[in-house]
Amino acid sequence: HGDFLAERIDNKLVGGVSMLSGYINKVRAEEENVIYCIAGDMFRGSVIDAEYKGVSTIEIMNLLGPDVVTIGNHEVDYGLSHLLFIEKCANFPIINANFHIRTNNKRLFQPFYIAHIDGMKILFIGIITEDVLAQTKMDKVIGSFVDICEAAEEIGRICNTYNPIDIDFTIILTHIGFEEDKKLAAMLDPDWGVDVIIGGHSHTFLEQPVKVNDILIVQAGTGTDQIGRFDIMVDTDLNAVDTYTWSTVPIDETHCPRDEGLENFIMHYKDLTDKKYGRL
């Protein structure tokens, strides 16, 4: 949501992409097998984003370096054709399994991403529903599957196709809201092997994962004031979660070093927009 810049709260700098990047880089340096995911809504919320219709955001995200991202409803705010252009500007996979062209049912995005981590194959599938993408309901050419039931069926088709190639762990990246995540988890066949749902849209701040149908559901609010950290040990014999810890880590100057290169890059955009819109 364009939460690029830190704010001073209680005499402490909080949030902002440069400290978020500093924390992610710190974890990547300290730990092995780190994956950084975004569950949609990179766009909007900032004049820096709006002035450049998301191009500035994608350039900032390229420096932030997520491993995999799914789309949210605000990704289509500048139009679907522009989103397809933006997707080509990204240096990271943007996945969605159920956004398609109505006339021939071809997908608009890569539906999944397989991460190879320490000998494991981790399958990520991106999901959004038409209830979230209200602005596409009248579109005669482009749309999503109508409801969460069809989203569940699409997950099943992908899992059944790729599980035979020895997928070790499956994560669904959604942008449908926490209540819908719970409904979705309840619909998934255990034989499909879904382990985790990482959700967005409802901005739900979960202190602990919620388990539905033996699937762990997590969400970490919104913005850059915090990040969800999910440390998972996988039983590779069962291809399932063995143990885990979940926490929401504050992004502030007491926890996070600043990524100065990214800060300078953002300030370049801020200076340009300030000159255009700033008051004398």
Regions found by a protein language model. Give the residues of each.
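Active-site nucleophile-His-acid catalytic modules used for acyl/amide transfer and hydrolysis
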Residues: L262-L280
